């Protein structure tokens, strides 16, 4: 995979999130890998995409009531089948790390790339996810 001139992966599905902003610095020095599943422990569907684009419907699952007002995103989502969706170009700040500090530097979103793996802390990831993570 290659990053094109618009800072998007050439083989990723693009679903741009409004939950991003310009970076103050161009230096990227941190990769943050998270996991997510919506509803928790359930895989497939488009709830993560809806969540990152502020289109989640709280009537679809009781859990969504707790997160409906959050405005978050990541640069990439790698689903269980290894497919990649990009929400924020790499030259912009995705809102994935919240209030954060790494090596005495605050606001990790400012100098990091955020990648979400569809999954949970308790469930092993799929081989396809690891392969896509390596390729990205």
What is each of the regions a protein language model found here?
Residues 2-24, 30, 37-135:
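Active-site-adjacent loop/helix surface patches within enzyme catalytic domains
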């Amino acid at each position: 995979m290659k990053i094109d001139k618009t800072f998007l992966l050439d083989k990723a599905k693009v679903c741009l999130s409004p939950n991003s902003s310009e970076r103050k610095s161009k230096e990227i020095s941190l990769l943050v890998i998270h996991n997510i599943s919506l509803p928790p422990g359930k895989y497939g569907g488009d709830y993560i995409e809806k969540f990152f684009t502020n289109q989640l419907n709280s009537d679809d699952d009781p859990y969504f009531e707790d997160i409906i007002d959050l405005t978050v995103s990541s640069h990439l989502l790698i689903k269980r089948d290894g497919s990649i969706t990009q929400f924020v170009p790499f030259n912009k700040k995705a809102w994935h790390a919240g209030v954060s500090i790494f090596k005495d530097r605050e606001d990790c979103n400012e100098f990091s790339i955020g990648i979400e793996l569809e999954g949970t802390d308790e469930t092993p990831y799929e081989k396809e996810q690891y392969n896509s993570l390596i390729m990205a």
